[in-house]
């Protein structure tokens, strides 16, 4: 009896051990990741130890070289594009991204009044304010006092330049200020605010010199018996004042620098300027023939054209 019971207990123990061993084997096979996860990261498995593979190194070097070449070429293209844009921006029709036309009010809100006035637009704003102030003086003060007290005939040489700020006609000051605001802002951004100021004064001086030269030529021709029918040769000098010379110098130089037109507004202004220049040339050709002309009132425009041509010649030589 004892032998039977002992043999039966051995079979049960063997069966229980075999069944528990099979269950453990199944658990290990079903959840290998869990057992690996419980181990430390450095001792998890032999497969986690890095091995040196020459093919992988060569493959990574090729990939690295591919991306490095691509990124280098892209960076080179970007740098080359920036250089080309900076070189072509002076002569192209596209404008800088700051000023009256593009992003003006956004930058104005960020920078404020002081930086806006001190910049390129500040010179244009100052010229417009100065012309408006002198125009108001013509409206308020006595015209005879304005003409006789501060004039070139009274010995005031500076009036050769200050005459470029004097407007009497409303349409004249409106057209000139629109032209100066549009073309002047582009010149100031391209060549600098100081250059715009010098160009304005040079245009005013050139217009005054051409006006005086024309009257000197007119007196010489009349002394030789040549009759010239100038409808405005005896007109008061008040009709010959204005910033026509300065506006034409600025507008024509801008047309030389930016030959392409990008907006309809610019096209309208350029057509107006070119029409007046062509009309001026026709009137100059009529002088030797004794035909009727209005060259006296257009002499300021002629001075501006001459100043613009001289400025463009200096810019092409790199001196401006």
UniProtKB/Swiss-Prot annotation:
Keywords, sorted A to Z: Chloroplast, Membrane, Plastid, Transit peptide, Transmembrane, Transmembrane helix
Transit peptide, start-end: 1-87
Gene Ontology MF terms: serine-type endopeptidase activity
Record-annotated membrane-spanning stretches: 116-136, 160-180, 199-219, 247-267, 295-315
Pfam families: Rhomboid
GO cellular component terms given for this protein: chloroplast membrane
Family (UniProt): Belongs to the peptidase S54 family.
PANTHER family cross-referenced by the UniProt entry: RHOMBOID PROTEASE, RHOMBOID-LIKE PROTEIN 16, CHLOROPLASTIC-RELATED
Chain's role: Probable rhomboid-type serine protease that catalyzes intramembrane proteolysis.
UniProt protein name: Rhomboid-like protein 17, chloroplastic
Organism of this sequence: Arabidopsis thaliana (Mouse-ear cress)
Upper taxonomic lineage: Eukaryota, Viridiplantae, Streptophyta, Embryophyta, Tracheophyta
């Amino acid at each position: 009896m004892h032998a039977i019971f002992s043999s039966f207990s051995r079979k049960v123990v063997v069966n229980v051990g075999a069944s528990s061993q099979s269950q453990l084997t199944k658990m290990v096979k079903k959840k290998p990741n869990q057992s690996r996860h419980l181990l430390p990261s450095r001792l998890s498995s032999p497969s986690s130890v890095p091995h040196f593979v020459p093919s992988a190194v060569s493959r990574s070097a090729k990939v690295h070289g591919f991306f490095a070449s691509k990124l280098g070429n892209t960076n080179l293209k970007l740098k080359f594009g920036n250089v080309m844009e900076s070189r072509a921006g002076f002569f192209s029709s596209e404008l800088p991204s700051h000023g009256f036309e593009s992003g003006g009010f956004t930058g104005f809100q960020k920078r404020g009044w002081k930086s806006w006035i001190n910049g390129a637009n500040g010179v244009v704003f100052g010229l417009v304010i100065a012309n408006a102030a002198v125009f108001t003086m013509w409206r308020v003060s006595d015209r005879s006092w304005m003409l006789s007290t501060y004039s070139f005939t009274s010995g005031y040489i500076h009036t050769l330049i200050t005459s470029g700020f004097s407007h009497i006609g409303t349409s004249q000051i409106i057209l000139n200020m629109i032209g100066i605001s549009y073309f002047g802002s582009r010149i100031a951004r391209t060549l600098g605010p100081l250059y715009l100021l010098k160009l304005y004064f040079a245009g005013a001086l050139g217009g005054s010199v051409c006006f005086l030269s024309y009257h000197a030529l007119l007196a010489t021709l009349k002394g030789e018996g040549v009759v010239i029918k100038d409808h405005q040769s005896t007109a008061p000098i008040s009709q010959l004042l204005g910033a026509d010379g300065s506006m034409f110098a600025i507008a024509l130089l801008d047309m030389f620098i930016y030959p392409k037109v990008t907006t309809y507004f610019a096209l309208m202004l350029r057509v107006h300027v070119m029409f007046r220049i062509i009309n001026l040339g026709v009137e100059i050709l009529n002088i030797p023939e004794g035909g009727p002309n209005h060259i006296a009132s257009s002499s300021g425009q002629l001075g501006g054209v001459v100043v613009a041509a001289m400025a463009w010649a200096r810019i092409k030589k790199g001196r401006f």
